[in-house]
């Protein structure tokens, strides 16, 4: 395959107000502005959701700074809303299952079934897992929890070595690693 760096296009779209685009397939309450703002500042696209990233850093949620919440569209009440919606959906599904003559089992987006299938059958799969940093990321503390690509097969979960992260990203991550010790 070939490699195309889409960062310049993503940044230009954000600065022109064309990104992030509304999530028509998912939750429209979460606009991912924090994710793009951090991409602009850090030079790397953040894979964490805007809701979580706003919680993990001191820049977007501050006492007396409701203007930041509004500007970056941080959905402070998102998780309680999701819980209410999920509970209602589970009750609806329960009734459907109780009355169904047949139930079709489909894989979910959760990793548990993927991991179990890969270990049990030996069919390889790649997940992004939280594992102990045993030489995986050089400039983060050994023993801390890190999220890396992992190969899963009959041999179990095998994390991928990342190497050294850009120093400003490692420093930002360290602020959240500090609570692990």
Please place each PLM-identified region on the residue numbering.
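Long, compositionally biased stretches enriched for glycine and/or charged residues
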Residues: 1-181
């Amino acid at each position: 395959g070939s490699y195309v760096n889409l960062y310049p296009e993503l940044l230009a779209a954000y600065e022109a107000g064309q990104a992030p685009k509304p999530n028509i397939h998912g939750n429209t309450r979460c606009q991912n502005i924090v994710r793009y703002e951090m991409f602009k500042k850090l030079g790397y696209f953040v894979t964490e959701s805007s809701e979580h990233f706003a919680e993990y850093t001191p820049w977007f949620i501050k006492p007396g700074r409701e203007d930041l919440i509004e500007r970056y569209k941080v959905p402070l009440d998102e998780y309680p809303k999701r819980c209410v919606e999920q509970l209602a959906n589970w009750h609806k599904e329960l009734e459907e299952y109780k009355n169904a003559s047949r139930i079709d089992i489909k894989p979910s987006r959760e990793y548990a079934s993927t991991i179990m299938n890969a270990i049990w059958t030996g069919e390889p799969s790649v997940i992004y897992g939280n594992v102990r940093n045993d030489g995986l990321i050089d400039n983060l503390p050994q023993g801390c929890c890190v999220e890396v690509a992992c190969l899963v097969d009959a041999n179990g979960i095998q994390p991928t070595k990342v190497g050294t992260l850009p120093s400003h990203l490692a420093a930002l991550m360290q602020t959240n690693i500090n609570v692990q010790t």
